[in-house]
Each structure stands twice: as structure tokens, then as C-alpha cells.
Amino acid sequence: MNLDNLIDQWFEDRGIVENGKTMSQAIKTLEETTELIDAINKEDRIELMDAVGDIYVTLRGVCKVEGVDFHDCVDRAYHEIKDRKGYLSANGTF
């Protein structure tokens, strides 16, 4: 079983898919995003990795509760950005 399936099963096993609220999962995503910002500010690579993983998990939770495919969402996002021509310069301008 791959990680996505294990994560999805975790949400199923805890009744989150059946009884969860999308807003609750969105709030968890926001909390984890705050932890990511803290990790970046502290230059803590381990905490950064943990936060990125947690954000991924909470976003999968949003999708499970809403009944949408996570990878379809990522595919949509990619198709929105794929033709953009911008480039981030060394001085931080885009």
C-alpha cells in the first residue's frame, strides 16, 4: 500500500471522511502552514519537513471529506501555471 492509500485509510478509520467537516481540515492546514513558517524562520530543516508532510496530509483530508481526487486538484493547479513565463531573479523579483 502506498503512502497516499495509507493516509486516506487513516482518515477513513477515524471517521473523518464520514463525519468530518471541510472547514476543520482547512483550519488544520492553516495551523500546519503556520508551523512551516515557524520552521523556515528558525531554519529548522527537520521541522520544515514535518510541516510539509503535515500540510500534505491535511490537504488530502480536505479532498477526502469533499469527495474530490487530490491528484485531480494538483493537475488543475499545474495546468494553471504550466504556461507562465515568469522567473524569480536573484534579487527576489518575479
Predicted regions and their residues:
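Flexible "arm" and connector segments at domain edges
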Residues: 1-52, 56-94
